Amino acid sequence: MTSTLVDTNVLIDIIANPDPASWSVQTLRNCAEAGELVINTVIWSEISGAYPVEPKPEVLFRGLILKIENLPVDAGYPAGAAHVAYRRAGGLRERTLPDFLIGAHAVVRGFSLMTR
C-alpha cells in the first residue's frame, strides 16, 4: 500500500472544481485506490486559513478520507537546508519554506507526493 501526501494546490483544485473529469480529481482517485491519502498541518493551515471559521475536513473535502499528520521533526532539517540552497542558487520565490516542508515530509515518511 502506497501512502500519498496531497499538496495544497491539488486540494484547492478539488474545492474549486470538483468535476470528476478534472486532472486533480482523477489523479486523487487513483492515489486513493493505491493507498492512504495524507495531508499535514502545513497543508491544513494553507487550506483552512482561508475560511472565517475552521471547517471540518470531511465536510470541506466532500467525504474524502484524508489522514492529517503532524509534520515530522526529522523533516525540519532537510526542508531548511533545501530552502537555503534554493535561495543561494538564486531562487526568486521567497515564500517557499512551506513547500520544502511538505516535500521533506513526503521524503522522510516514504510517501508519494501529489502536486501540480
PLM regions: where:
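Conserved glycosyltransferase catalytic-site signature
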Residues: 8, 41, 98-100
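Structured helix-beta-strand junction loops
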Residues: 33-35, 63-67, 109
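Short, well-structured N-terminal submotif of metal-dependent ribonuclease cores
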Residues: 1-39, 49-60
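Short, well-ordered alpha-helical scaffold segment located
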Residues: 10, 43-46, 75
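Short, flexible loop segments at the rims of nucleotide/cofactor-binding pockets, characterized by
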Residues: 14-18, 46, 89-93
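Active-site neighborhoods of divalent-metal-dependent phosphate/nucleic-acid chemistry enzymes
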Residues: 67-116
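Helix-loop "lid/cap" segments that line or gate small-molecule binding pockets
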Residues: 46-47, 65
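Active-site-proximal, substrate-binding regions of enzyme catalytic domains
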Residues: 52-74
